[in-house]
């Protein structure tokens, strides 16, 4: 089994369970993972308490903390004013305590997405005062939050990919918890060009310090003034998927569902959102987005779940426009392929001098420039092969025709085993499409209360297999009849947590002789210049199967940006507070100035013939 595939599986691990494939996995210090996670006497010792005041405030001073929460409270008020749906000012319940208990797992008693329960921006994001002020002021003016998403845009907050990222621990984690955190860092190392080095003696310069003083929480991106930044991982956060989520914040990721194009993919149910949380769902300014051309991703580890910040247990706050994607959003098992692709586009695009002819949505691997990094389900130097089964003989390439071809989970109708994986590529003849239906009994482990798949069958039927597909789980046979957009359709069976009955399905080829209705008008472009925006249109197929997509997305407003842009500048200035009394001491200050735009095009685009092109 390849190291890449094995490390992908790592992120399904919760506090103590690890799949068998990684028991021989080695870290930089040469430790074997079976020794790596063994509890020692040190793990059973009480944690050393963290007493520094700034640790309690996650690196902020008392005054900074008050300023940030002043603007967060104003943002909360603004959200309730703009979206009064479902708000009852006469409600007298203690909703704060009830909300914190609400989404605990029925069976295992654990918080499914613990980062949502924090007291910070969007639950787990530590803002600096200037960020909080900017977010509120732009929301006040435009109804949107002016922040660069999905990836932070300021160069001051991006790490230097040519230098190792220093990290340390403040002593509040047990040695076992430290090992799990380092395993998550090792995963980021393996799938990007980024390197991490532990230095517990570092006392200056940019570095990440892991603590456990404030739930699950992190700043976004590198500290612009070259100081330490805290990533809080309390005991309930010590799961590899949650750790990867918080580390992604520290590396520059914001949350997925706040992208300005989100209304093309999900519907925010304002009437179902907790009255103190509506400010968390305002969108960003579309002219200030940096998604590096990576599309909206239902399967992103940075996406809220379906019932995030809901008033009551059974209310959806986010509904996907395509219903079959509903159980895809909110997963904290593993980084999606597009999460990894975006990180590599931002930090690693110049590592490999030659770009390989990768297939199936793959791209040149910055860790191995002679191979492609492939979407789940594919392998080979150029992603030309279907990934073989793991734990069972299953999967492969199936050529379908006009008759039904059946395939199923391992051993069906007997139960499959935990840890088994199968990948199928269903191929129809030229000019035809694949139709797939589930048949027979269906059982895959899910969190019913949270509307989230844990084990699943995923179907990718779009033109780009890099995008996360529709995930099916729980109990009862899905009634959906799925058709591919091209001659190919991908089906992934993944059992990370439990065994079960599994699934049986059938597939056949259909002539692509349906008739498309006219395209709808284009939606407004999400950005005004620089090929930074996208627009969408839809169409409906009738009288059979239609080749092609019912939805089309397009880069728009490709003319270069000009005029003035906001830039962050760091310069020496007068010190405040106690330091102002010291003669000759100068302090670094960051301020925003309007200057001619440096980047006429979004990352990944350049000016050719007066237009921004890839």
Curated annotation (Swiss-Prot):
GO terms for biological process: molting cycle, collagen and cuticulin-based cuticle; proteolysis. Residues 150-349 form the Peptidase M12A domain. The keyword Mitochondrion does not apply. PANTHER family: DISCOIDIN, CUB, EGF, LAMININ , AND ZINC METALLOPROTEASE DOMAIN CONTAINING, ZINC METALLOPROTEINASE DPY-31. Residues 394-510 form the CUB domain. Zn(2+) binds at residues 245, 249, 255. The active site is at residue 246. The keyword Repeat does not apply. GO terms for molecular function: metalloendopeptidase activity; zinc ion binding. Residues 344-384 form the EGF-like domain. Keywords: Cleavage on pair of basic residues, Disulfide bond, EGF-like domain, Glycoprotein, Hydrolase, Metal-binding, Metalloprotease, Protease, Secreted, Signal, Zinc, Zymogen. Residues 513-562 form the TSP type-1 domain. Residues 1-24 form the signal peptide. It comes from the Eukaryota. It comes from Teladorsagia circumcincta (Brown stomach worm). It is found in: Secreted. Binds 1 zinc ion per subunit. Its cofactor is Zn(2+). Its EC number is 3.4.24.-. This is Zinc metalloproteinase dpy-31. The gene is dpy-31. Glycans are attached at residues 190, 461. Residues 25-150 form a propeptide.
């Amino acid at each position: 089994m390849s190291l890449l595939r094995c490390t992908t599986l790592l992120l399904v691990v919760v506090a103590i369970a690890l799949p068998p494939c990684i028991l021989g996995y080695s870290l930089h210090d040469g430790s074997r993972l079976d020794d790596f996670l063994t509890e020692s006497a040190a793990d059973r010792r009480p944690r050393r308490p963290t007493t520094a005041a700034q640790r309690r405030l996650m690196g902020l001073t008392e005054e900074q903390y008050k300023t940030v929460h002043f603007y967060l409270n104003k943002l909360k008020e603004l959200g309730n004013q703009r979206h009064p749906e479902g708000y009852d000012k006469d409600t007298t319940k203690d909703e704060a305590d009830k909300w914190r208990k609400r989404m605990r797992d029925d069976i295992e008693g654990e918080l499914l997405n613990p980062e949502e329960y924090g007291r910070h921006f969007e639950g787990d994001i530590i803002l600096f005062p200037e960020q909080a002020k900017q977010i509120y002021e732009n929301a006040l003016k435009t109804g949107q939050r002016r922040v660069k998403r999905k990836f932070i845009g300021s160069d001051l907050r991006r790490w230097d990919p040519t230098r190792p990222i220093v990290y340390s621990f403040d002593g509040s984690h047990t040695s076992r918890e430290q090992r799990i955190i380092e395993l998550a860092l090792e995963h980021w190392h393996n799938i990007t060009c980024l390197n991490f080095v532990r230095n517990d003696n570092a006392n200056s310069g940019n570095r990440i310090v892991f603590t456990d003083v404030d739930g699950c929480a992190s700043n976004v991106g590198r500290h612009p003034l070259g100081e330490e930044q805290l990533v809080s991982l309390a005991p309930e956060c010590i799961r590899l998927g949650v750790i990867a989520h918080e580390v992604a914040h520290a590396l520059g990721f914001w949350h997925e569902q706040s992208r300005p194009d989100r209304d093309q993919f999900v519907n925010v149910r304002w009437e179902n959102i907790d009255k103190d949380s509506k400010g968390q769902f305002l969108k960003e300014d579309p002219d200030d987005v940096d998604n590096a051309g990576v599309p909206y991703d239902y399967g992103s580890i940075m996406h809220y779940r379906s019932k995030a910040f809901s008033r009551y247990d059974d209310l959806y706050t986010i509904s996907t426009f395509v219903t079959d994607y509903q159980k895809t959003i909110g997963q904290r098992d593993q980084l999606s392929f597009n999460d990894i692709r975006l990180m590599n586009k931002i930090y690693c695009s110049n590592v490999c001098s030659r770009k390989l002819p990768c297939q199936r949505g793959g791209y040149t691997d910055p860790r191995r420039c002679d191979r492609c990094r492939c979407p789940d389900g594919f392998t080979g130097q150029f992603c030309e092969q279907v990934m073989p089964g793991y734990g069972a003989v299953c999967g492969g390439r199936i050529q379908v025709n006009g008759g039904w071809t059946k395939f199923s989970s391992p051993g069906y109708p007997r139960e499959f085993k935990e840890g088994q994986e199968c990948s199928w590529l269903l191929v129809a003849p030229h000019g035809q499409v694949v139709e797939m239906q589930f048949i027979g009994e269906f059982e895959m482990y899910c969190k019913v209360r949270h509307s989230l798949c844990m084990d699943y069958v995923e179907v990718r039927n779009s033109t780009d297999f890099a995008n996360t597909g529709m995930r099916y789980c729980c109990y009862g046979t899905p009634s959906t009849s799925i058709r591919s957009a091209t001659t190919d359709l991908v089906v992934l069976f993944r059992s990370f947590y439990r065994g079960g009955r599994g699934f049986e399905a059938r597939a056949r080829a259909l002539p692509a002789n349906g008739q498309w209705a006219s395209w709808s008008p284009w939606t407004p472009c999400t950005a005004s210049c620089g090929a930074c925006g996208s627009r969408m249109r839809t169409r409906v197929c009738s009288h059979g199967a239609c080749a092609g997509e019912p939805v089309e997305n397009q880069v728009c407003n490709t003319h270069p940006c000009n005029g003035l842009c906001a830039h962050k500048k760091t310069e020496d200035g007068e010190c405040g507070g106690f330091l102002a009394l010291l003669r000759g001491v100068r302090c670094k200050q960051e301020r925003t100035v309007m200057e001619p735009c440096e980047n006429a095009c979004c990352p990944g685009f350049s000016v050719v013939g007066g237009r921004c092109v890839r």
